[in-house]
Amino acid sequence: VAAAAYGTDTITKADKIVGPGNIFVATAKKLCYGVVDIDMIAGPSEILIVADENANPKYIAADLMSQAEHDKLASAILITTSKELVKNVDKELVRQVEDLPRKDIIKSSLDNYGGAVIVDSIKEGINLSNKIAPEHLEVLVDNPLEQLPNIKNAGSIFLGEYTPEPLGDYMSGTNHVLPTGGTAKFYSALGVYDFIKHSAFSYYPQAVLGT
């Protein structure tokens, strides 16, 4: 990162450094910012799921772990209107995690940065999600498209139980370099506009400016 930011005898100095990385990459980008532009300081990974009582606990558990397995510092949060769903998701987490090769990382992540919040309505759940501004947001409710206008802050949004977050990482084509740590309130996913800049210009003829 430093070589790209400052240049060396064999590496041309870059104007901008983008892309994901671990805590060391993120720290290096932060230290070099100003000498070179960066996209954002991203990580650790996050997933937040807003679900109603009809959501499938097997899917929710799998999707929570899809991010928890990334890093012991990753966060995985469920917001739901159903206490019963929380109980069933917890059972699924216990059952599914034992079959996964990164189970120790998942358990550490969920123990320290996982959780469930019970709300009175999906509207309240979406409002809470907007305050958290998660990197990845799944909306597992009846008619999820109806909730889209209410979502203000999220890096990438996944609507419906057949649109799991890993689709965004590997298949759907949406960029998976995303804002974390609440920065989705003012950052967007990496995109073409991150590589475009503009300049202001002025031109006054003498007749307009006067003498």
List where the protein language model places each region:
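Short loop-to-beta-strand entry elements in the cores of soluble alpha/beta enzymes
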Residues: 18-20, 40-51, 67-90, 106-117, ...
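C-terminal core of ALDH-fold dehydrogenases
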Residues: 122, 130-211
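Short acidic-hydrophobic, aromatic-tinged amphipathic segments that line or gate anion-handling sites
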Residues: 1, 116-121
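Short, solvent-exposed amphipathic alpha-helical segments in soluble enzyme
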Residues: 9, 32-35, 63-68, 92-96, ...
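A short, aliphatic-rich alpha-helical micro-motif
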Residues: 11, 110-111, 151-152
